[in-house]
Regions:
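Bacterial N-terminal signal peptides that target proteins for export
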Residues: 1-9
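Bacterial N-terminal signal peptides
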Residues: 9-21
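N-terminal low-complexity or amphipathic/hydrophobic leaders
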Residues: 55-130
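General beta-strand structural signal in soluble alpha/beta enzymes
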Residues: 92-94, 151-153, 179-183, 201-203, ...
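Extracellular/luminal Protease-associated
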Residues: 132, 138-183
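Ligand/cofactor pocket segment of small-molecule handling proteins
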Residues: 172-211
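Acidic, glycine-rich flexible loop/linker segments
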Residues: 204-247
Length: 247
């Protein structure tokens, strides 16, 4: 008996049977639409829904200003040794408008995308429905809490810029601790002014153009460099890079 032929015959059974079952299945309906109707005003109520955040349900731990103050004096190496499996949540490659100034606070996240006609039209539709502003830095100037760090996903070194000194002023006036931009900023000279000495901005590049990218998600998970940042994460930024970890 040819053992090789027997082996091939047995293997063919395991291949043919699943394929035959697959062939009997109903084809996926590409036009399927879930029977869900959003309540009036839901789309434009300034909240970006995230299913993954519903599942994660990160615990809301009140981090006091005193605790944040302590982190300003803890070496990054000590933090590295204390955060366990979150050690890899460390993003690098930033410049700092206030060299040597550490940035500590809670993450207020936002995500931006390059404009295209249909996306721009969608943003305009939401603006007509309610209080929706694609310039999420302006929204942060209305909603940020003291100690927040605005964390903006803007495509890294190939992306666009977020804001300039006027946008930063609004966020600073809310008591926010600073900003981290995975992308660019404008008004480099202005943001290095002494009035921003306690408001460091970590950024990838400086660009004089005004921003044109659209804010699409607010206070949802974002990607900064090669790491994931969740709303409310503790942020510790220093020379060399930034740690993000749960509170």
């Amino acid at each position: 008996m040819n053992i090789r032929l027997v082996g091939l015959s047995i293997l063919s059974i395991f291949i043919i049977v699943p394929l035959s079952k697959l062939a009997a299945q109903e084809p996926f309906n590409q036009n399927f639409s879930p029977d869900i109707t959003a309540p009036d005003g839901f789309r434009s109520n300034r909240t970006s829904y995230s299913a993954i955040m519903d599942v994660l349900e990160p615990p809301v731990t009140e981090v006091t200003e005193e605790q944040l103050q302590r982190l300003r004096d803890v070496p990054l190496e000590v933090i590295f040794g204390a955060i366990g499996d979150y050690r890899l949540n460390y993003a690098t490659g930033f410049e700092n408008t206030q060299p040597g100034k550490r940035l500590v606070g809670r993450a207020l996240t936002m995500r931006f995308l390059p404009p295209r006609p249909d996306l721009t039209e969608a943003a305009l539709t939401l603006a007509k429905e309610g209080n929706w502003d694609r310039r999420y830095y302006a929204r942060a100037a209305e909603e940020a809490n003291p100690g927040d760090v605005v964390v903006a996903e803007l495509g890294g070194s190939d992306g666009h810029n977020l804001f300039g000194d006027m946008g930063a002023t609004g966020i600073q006036m809310r008591g926010a601790a600073g900003v981290i931009i995975d992308g660019g900023m404008r008004d480099y000279t202005g943001l290095r002014d002494e009035r921003f000495e306690d408001f460091p901005v970590f950024y990838k590049f400086s660009d004089p153009h005004t921003t044109s990218w659209l804010g699409v998600e607010y206070n949802t998970p974002v990607r900064i460099g090669g790491v994931t940042v969740l709303p409310g994460d503790i942020v510790v930024g220093d020379t060399g890079g930034v740690f993000f970890f749960p509170s």
